[in-house]
């Protein structure tokens, strides 16, 4: 893949959220509010230091692309949802979410127009660019996920709500793009369950006008509480807490790939990134589907080869074996590898070890490809 004019074989990166430095999580003013960001020099300095620490972990592991780590929250729900509620003008009070895996989280409530209340990812992007000279990636929670996780008392339809959220997110994305980040990632972790009829339109609206960065659509089963995601069965009632003990059986008929390919190809994206080796993805997430629905021209495929729902660190050989299997389906010049999802639910030292394994396993396969090319 061509990154900053350099051809990188099987580029490596982590998907997203990462264990924060503990001192940053204890920062009393970390969750500032209002339209001025950050409100003072002390918090600005702390933010930059936290992003630099997370960037340094990635650089030491040898990742090709450095991510922001979603430093704006100290837990998965805060990073993926509640932070956005505050930035988009939600009331943080609301009923339960209607998705089985997230059903014990509360939806934010909308009582008026969606708009940005201060920048969303601009300050993180600035700090990341300052922290590293390597290619950078900034990520956002997807429009479908945010739209579905809303107790709406204002808009007449979910489509109206989605397009309003997309417009607000797009304002921020354009500012981040203008800073010169290399990749902008949109996390659509409810796509494997179903696509709303406006899903692709809203995704494309959110990234409209991006001129510099490559667009990544990250799709996974979700990672709340470390649980494997699942399809609901008839015991699940929308809007209620879903009692796992009453679930009749694990859904096994669908895979992440089978759920989103080829529909996801309609989105304006440069990279499709899927969870591929986790507990719901024992068969590499059903990637055989891509043989019948090949990648569109100029779209790369990045696959998760690190299981973030296990504390066991993969060996380099295990990672290499997963990459070799991927190469049976996706050519090396269009393949990248990542973690399955964010690493925040792990201890930081385990997250560091997993990033090292990701890089070392990729090095093994790169060497094999180089040797085969020389012999040809």
UniProtKB/Swiss-Prot annotation:
One of its GO terms (biological process) is methionine biosynthetic process. Keywords: Lyase, Metal-binding, Plasmid, Zinc. CDD domains: CIMS_C_terminal_like. One of its GO terms (molecular function) is 2-hydroxypropyl-CoM lyase activity. Zn(2+) binds at residues 218, 220, 341. It catalyses: (R)-2-hydroxypropyl-coenzyme M = (R)-1,2-epoxypropane + coenzyme M; (S)-2-hydroxypropyl-coenzyme M = (S)-1,2-epoxypropane + coenzyme M. InterPro entries: Met_Synth_C/arc, UROD/MetE-like_sf. Optimum pH is 8.0-8.5. Transmembrane segments: none annotated. Pfam families: Meth_synt_2. Its EC number is 4.4.1.23. Its cofactor is Zn(2+). Inhibited by methylepoxypropane. Inhibited by the zinc chelator 4-(2-pyridylazo)resorcinol (PAR), in the presence of p- (hydroxymercuri)benzenesulfonic acid (PMPS), and by EDTA. Not inhibited by the coenzyme M analog 2-bromoethanesulfonate (BES). Binds 1 zinc ion per subunit. Zinc plays a key role in activating an organic thiol substrate for nucleophilic attack on an alkyl-donating substrate. Pathway: Alkene metabolism; propylene degradation. It is an enzyme of class 4 (lyase). Belongs to the vitamin-B12 independent methionine synthase family. Involved in aliphatic epoxide carboxylation. Catalyzes the addition of coenzyme M (CoM) to either R- or S-epoxypropane to form the thioether conjugate 2-hydroxypropyl-CoM. Catalyzes the reaction of CoM with R-epoxypropane at a rate approximately twice of that with S-epoxypropane. The CoM analogs 2-mercaptopropionate, 2-mercaptoethanol and cysteine substitute poorly for CoM as the thiol substrate. Homohexamer. Component I of the aliphatic epoxide carboxylation complex together with components II, III and IV. This is 2-hydroxypropyl-CoM lyase.
């Amino acid at each position: 893949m061509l990154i900053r004019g350099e051809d990188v074989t099987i580029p490596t990166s982590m998907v997203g959220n990462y264990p924060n430095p503990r001192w940053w999580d204890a920062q009393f003013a970390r969750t500032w509010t209002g339209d001025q960001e950050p409100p003072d020099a002390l918090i600005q300095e702390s933010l930059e230091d936290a992003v630099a620490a997370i960037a340094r972990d990635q650089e030491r592991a040898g990742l090709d692309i450095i991510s922001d780590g979603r430093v704006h929250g100290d837990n998965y729900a805060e990073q993926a949802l509640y932070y956005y509620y505050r930035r988009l003008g939600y009331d943080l009070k609301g009923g339960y979410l209607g998705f089985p895996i997230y059903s014990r989280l509360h939806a934010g409530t909308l009582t008026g127009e969606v708009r940005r209340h201060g920048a969303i990812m601009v300050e993180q992007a600035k700090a990341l660019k300052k922290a590293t000279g390597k290619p950078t990636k900034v990520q956002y929670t997807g429009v479908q996920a945010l739209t579905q996780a809303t107790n709406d008392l204002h808009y007449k339809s979910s489509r109206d709500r989605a397009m309003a959220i997309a417009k607000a997110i797009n304002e921020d994305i354009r500012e981040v793009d203008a800073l010169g980040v290399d990749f902008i990632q949109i996390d659509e972790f409810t796509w494997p369950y179903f696509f709303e009829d406006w899903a692709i339109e809203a995704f494309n609206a959110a990234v409209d006008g991006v001129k510099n960065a490559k667009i990544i659509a990250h799709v996974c089963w979700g990672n709340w509480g470390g649980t494997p995601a699942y399809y609901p069965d008839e015991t699940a009632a929308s809007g209620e807490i879903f009692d796992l003990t009453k679930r009749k059986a694990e859904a096994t008929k669908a895979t992440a790939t089978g759920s989103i390919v080829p529909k996801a190809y309609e989105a304006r994206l440069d990279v499709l990134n899927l969870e591929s080796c986790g507990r719901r993805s024992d068969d590499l997430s059903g990637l055989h589907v891509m043989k019948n629905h090949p990648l569109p021209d100029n779209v790369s495929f990045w696959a998760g080869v690190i299981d973030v729902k296990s504390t066991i660190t993969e060996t380099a050989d295990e990672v290499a074996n997963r990459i070799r299997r991927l190469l049976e389906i996706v050519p090396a010049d269009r393949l990248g590898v990542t973690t399955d999802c964010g690493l925040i639910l792990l201890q930081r030292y385990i997250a560091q070890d997993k990033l090292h394994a990701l890089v070392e396993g990729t090095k093994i396969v790169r060497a094999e490809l180089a040797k085969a090319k020389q012999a040809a």
